[in-house]
Amino acid sequence: MIQGTTSDAGKSTLVAGLCRLARRAGVRVAPFKPQNMALNSAVTVDGGEIGRAQALQAIAAGIAAHTDLNPVLLKPTSDRGAQVIIHGKARMNLDARAYHDYKPVAFEAVLESYARLQAAYETIFVEGAGSPAEINLRDRDIANMGFAEAVDCPVVLVADIDRGGVFAHLTGTLACLSASEQSRVRGFIINRFRGDVSLLKPGLDWLEAKTGKPVLGVVPYLHGLTLDAEDMLPPELRAAHDGGAARMLRVVVPVLPHISNHTDFDALRAHPQVDFEYVRSGTPVPPADLIILPGSKNVPGDLASLRAQGWDAVLQKHLRYGGRVIGICGGMQMLGREVADPHGVEGAPGTSAGLGWLDYSTVLTRDKTLKNVTGHLALPGSPEVAGYEIHMGETHGPALDTPALRLGDAQAAHPDGAISADGQILATYVHGLFDTPAACAALLAWAGLSDAEEIDYPALREASLERLADTLAEHLDLPKLFAAIG
């Protein structure tokens, strides 16, 4: 089990790389995360929903993403509450106190999934969540040492040296653990190191002498990996390329408080002809060719935030001067006349006025749509698209008579989304639009980039997984690691 001294220490990436190394060796391997809290998710082969990081790890392992890989997923809907997803299905919304009381039930689901994986795979790389040293969460912990103790799983601690204080992180975390938990820790991995590793050796020697546990490797800072993020936005909000493209398309995504599935935009960030930028609250929206309203886990709340920022006026001006707008999932719902939440699915019951630019309305429902889809964009050339739907809501109205996509095969195609009468606005429930090369190029051409190149985002991701695995093979003491974890 890979546990971290902090969130974003590199647990997800390390598990992905280790899964790829095991796959190379011919080992039947699976990733596993008992509990994840994330708004980036993926649809599984069994029709459920798991954290995006576990879907990436499944790709690394060469297996289909299944709900057993992440049996408990928490999707925050507010600062104090989250939607609780068990074995891929939304069960309820709970606040933090109520979920703490529910944890024994959730843990049963965790152990059921783990037992099934044990029966099917030779090796399982387990990923912890946050830090095992959160004293206030130790009671009823199911994500870190609580799980490791229950199934007798060895643990490796990883820390991010790029943040500073790596030795304090490791020794401090260890000191916060019980004696039995400390004995479960087999060693340390130091992640994201820059510079001459020989200068780090005195610190490594001190750490090993202090704790009696080995340093299993120092992993360098890897720039330019194209891998799906678990939840956090990338630290570099702007991705501009200097490859000499004659025409760059400027794309902006406003960062809403409950933004979800921002992995939709990874392919755009990697595109050599796209100048991409996330814009946070309090920041002016720069001039752009295309503004994309992303998915949201709280559409009424994010609509209110959008208006409070004055972004509705910015979008209106953008359209008035000929700009293009795409709304994806929650963003699509915002573009309509209203969003009704009669059951309080995403907050207090009520109805919120939409932006009103497309003639349809949405009612949020208790049932969630979860499915992988294929089809064709309603753009020149009808390019193929493959993606997925994750939403709680039904949308109806005349604007849907001019759909943005047709999903399914030609004999049983059904419409999705809408394109405005003036052709400036495109709305869809489908995530992953830009991952398909032809669809991405067609959407960029629609937005004004007539000579858009096709880039193969899945191939870029695969190359990054291979590079990650090569790096781990070089910088981890794999014989010592595998001996330590048994």
Curated annotation (Swiss-Prot):
Recorded hits in InterPro entries, A to Z, give: Class_I_gatase-like, CobQ/CobB/MinD/ParA_Nub-bd_dom, CobQ_GATase1, CobQ_N, CobQ_synth, GATase_3, P-loop_NTPase
Stored PROSITE patterns: GATASE_COBBQ
Active-site positions on this chain = 329, 431
Entry keywords, A to Z: Cobalamin biosynthesis, Glutamine amidotransferase
User: GATase cobBQ-type domain spans which residues?
Assistant: 248-439
What GO molecular function annotations does the UniProt record carry, in alphabetical order?
Answer: ABC-type vitamin B12 transporter activity; catalytic activity
GO annotation (BP), single: cobalamin biosynthetic process
Residue ranges annotated as coiled coil are none
Q: Which pathway does the protein contribute to? A: Cofactor biosynthesis; adenosylcobalamin biosynthesis
NCBIfam families with a match to the protein in the record: cobQ, PRK00784.1
Q: Which PANTHER family match?
A: COBYRIC ACID SYNTHASE, DETHIOBIOTIN SYNTHETASE
Explain the purpose of this protein. Catalyzes amidations at positions B, D, E, and G on adenosylcobyrinic A,C-diamide. NH(2) groups are provided by glutamine, and one molecule of ATP is hydrogenolyzed for each amidation.
Family listed: Belongs to the CobB/CobQ family. CobQ subfamily.
Q: What is this protein called in UniProt?
A: Cobyric acid synthase
Q: Which organism is it from?
A: Paraburkholderia phytofirmans (strain DSM 17436 / LMG 22146 / PsJN) (Burkholderia phytofirmans)
